[in-house]
Design a protein with these regions (language model features):
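Binuclear metal-dependent phosphoesterase catalytic core
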Residues: 2, 11, 73-77, 147-152, ...
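Active-site neighborhood of phospho(di)ester-bond hydrolases with catalytic His/Asp-centered motifs
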Residues: 2-3, 24-30, 48-53, 69, ...
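A short, gly/pro- and small-residue-rich
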Residues: 43-54, 142-145
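Short, structured coil segments at secondary-structure junctions
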Residues: 42-43, 63-64, 173-175
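Active-site environment of divalent metal-dependent phosphoester hydrolases
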Residues: 6-11, 31-37, 53-59, 89-93, ...
Length: 213
């Protein structure tokens, strides 16, 4: 996973061997689109991404050879990754949302969630509320991300937008939470993925204020 700042080891001083055993590259946002295009060119691994609050340039120059998973569930070798980019809204502009707006985005995905029977990995730019987030509005997390984890119990949640100010990993109930700042290698055993499939969330969407009837 990559986010927030371009890694000199992967760009300025690129050594192809550093990516030889990487199956998938996941960007959590706020990265130069040329950086993503570069990685897509020099590795066989697919590069998927969500946008950060500083990624307005993607509208005019999206990263070549990469896959945007915004508001979608991308499946890779049976692993389902749900993408929700953007930060908490703190000014006018793209890729920023209020809590209510983010909930509406999730609500629009209810049929995809039902069809895919949930998801395994949550990919976002912003953190979840009171989980590696900040006190200021730009770095505040979304409650709806916690709601998604409570309902679907994903194996992994990867996010960005708060730099190195928190530790790399923590746990939220059964979900492994990773801060993707700069770059971080995540290894998931096939056995762990298979075990998680056996614990997939409900086939029906959430009810209440997240998925109103």
């Amino acid at each position: 996973v990559i986010a927030d700042i371009e890694s000199k080891a992967l760009w300025d001083y690129f050594d192809k061997s550093m990516l030889e055993n990487v199956d998938l590259i996941v960007s959590c946002g706020d990265l130069n689109p040329k950086y993503l295009s570069f990685l897509a060119t020099f590795t066989k691994a697919p590069v998927i991404y969500v946008r950060g609050n500083h990624d307005a340039k993607y509208e005019m120059t999206p990263p070549d050879g990469c896959i945007c998973i915004e508001d979608d569930i991308f499946e890779f070798h049976g692993v389902r990754l749900l993408g929700l980019g953007g930060s908490m809204r703190y000014k006018e502009g793209s890729n920023m949302f209020t809590e209510k707006e983010m909930k509406k985005r999730v609500n629009k995905m209810r049929f995809k969630l039902r069809k895919k029977d949930g998801f395994d990995i949550l990919v976002t730019h912003a953190p979840a509320y009171q989980l590696n987030d900040g006190d200021d509005i730009p770095h505040k997390g979304f409650q709806v991300f916690r709601d998604l984890m409570d309902c679907y119990k994903p194996l992994l949640f990867v996010h960005a937008n708060y730099g190195g100010r928190y530790k790399r990993e923590c746990k939220y109930n059964e979900t492994r939470v990773v801060n993707a700042y700069e770059r971080y290698y995540i290894d998931i055993d096939d056995e762990v993925i298979e075990e998680n499939r056996k614990k997939r969330g409900p086939k029906t969407p959430l009810i209440g204020n997240l998925f109103p009837k």
